[in-house]
Amino acid sequence: MKKLLRIAVPLSLLASAASAQGSAPTAGEVIARIRDRAGVEARNPTVDTFKAGDSAARVRGIAVTMMATLDVLKRAVERGDNLVITHEPTFYSHRDTLGVLESENDEVLAVKKKYISDHKLVIWRFHDTPHAMKPDMIRAGIIHALDWDSRIRNGDAEVFDIPRTTVRALAAQLAGRLGARAVRISGDPLAVVRSAVLTEGFPGFAANRHAIQRGSPDVVIIGEDHEWETIEYVADAISAGQIDGMIVLGHIASEQAGMAEFARWLRPVVPGVRVDFVPTRDPFTFSR
């Protein structure tokens, strides 16, 4: 009888687990819920598509991240998550185009694809949708992380009137709030600033320039840009005495809080499914 009892308990647990797994939504169903709740028209074409795995797979857990690096994928697997929702590309280009890398048998790509396949991961990109939401979910997350909601000037969510500080002190505050390890400064670090323009990610020179023109800021804060475009433009503005400084956060640090915001937003959309925010580590640090 003891042997029968020892067998009966694990079988019962297995049956319960199988039942729970069978009732879990598929990856495709999760994404459909996200699209429905977001309530924005899908861009055509869009990069918000499945990048790997089977959309019919039952979801055990969701890992939300800024960028699905191999490090992030490993941490997702450790948590038991099999659906990864990433803001940025998985395979090194905006549209995750694999043609050249596969034709050249790229070894880095091969390792990543094998890991994804071995662990039956499903990867979906969430980029165009959050930026199309009103307000932009990624920007809103950053503003919340900085506690700048009340600092927005005249409803322009890229222009802020901030407490009096210096460029250096502001850079340190941003690094602490956003988890950036290698913030860069241009201009006089001790310059006193009271207004800022903030553009996350990589919106490009035209968008950055227009924000600067609208805001006439003391300091410009960006994620990243080509050094011969926004960087040079702001350097010239500093030399001309029009701007006091610039802070470059890095792309990941400048948008990561937006995906943390998305993870919070997602939990009530998929009740009963674990949603983990798995931050992407800042790839840079300073050499001392």
PLM regions and their residue ranges:
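Nuclease and nuclease-like effector domains acting on nucleic acids or nucleotide cofactors
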Residues: 1, 16, 20
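Active-site catalytic microenvironments in core metabolic enzymes, especially phosphate/sugar-handling
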Residues: 21-288
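Bacterial N-terminal signal peptides
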Residues: 8-16
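Bacterial N-terminal signal peptides that target proteins for export
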Residues: 1-8
